[in-house]
């Protein structure tokens, strides 16, 4: 099975789908939508392969002890690989959210939203990252 592509990459990389967040914002602005009215959506779930469910909540991703967390520095998002080095899950973490919030402030966007509350861990790691990133640029 093919490795899953990043579903919410901030920027393009070899592992992104057709669109990155940057591409989506640029397309909306090019179509005449005011950047100051745009809100960046941040998923609190990941996409997996046959070794993990296709959709996996962040709270379930962080307990996958058999996988190693990695970072795509071009796309600015994390992913997990198995012992053979194959990508198993693409997802968001506090670091990727911080980069997205920096981006939305640099672009002059209205803010961020996430989907969904219940997918976060018990500590609210991702919710707190969104709050800090949006409210404390």
Identify the residue ranges that each predicted region occupies.
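Substrate-binding surface in catalytic domains of secreted glycosidases
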Residues: 1-65
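Non-catalytic positions within long, well-ordered alpha-helices that form the structural scaffold/packing
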Residues: 29, 105-108
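Glycan-binding loop/region signatures in secreted carbohydrate-active enzymes
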Residues: 37-103, 123, 128-137
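Hydrophobic faces of well-ordered beta-strands that scaffold small-molecule active sites
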Residues: 38-42, 110-115
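A short, acidic, flexible beta-alpha connecting loop/helix-capping segment that sits on the rim
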Residues: 116-123
């Amino acid at each position: 099975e093919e490795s899953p592509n990043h579903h919410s990459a901030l920027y393009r990389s070899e592992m992104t789908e057709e669109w990155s967040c940057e591409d989506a914002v640029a397309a909306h602005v090019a179509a005449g939508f005011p950047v100051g009215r745009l809100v960046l959506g941040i998923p609190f779930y990941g996409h997996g392969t046959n070794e993990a469910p296709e959709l996996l909540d962040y709270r379930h991703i962080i307990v996958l002890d058999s996988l190693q967390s990695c970072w795509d520095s071009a796309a600015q998002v994390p992913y997990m690989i198995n012992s053979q080095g194959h990508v198993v899950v693409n997802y968001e973490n506090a670091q990727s959210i911080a980069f997205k919030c920096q981006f939305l402030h640099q672009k002059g966007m209205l803010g961020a939203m996430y989907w969904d509350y219940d997918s976060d861990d018990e500590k609210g790691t991702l919710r707190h990252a969104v709050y800090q990133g949006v409210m404390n640029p």
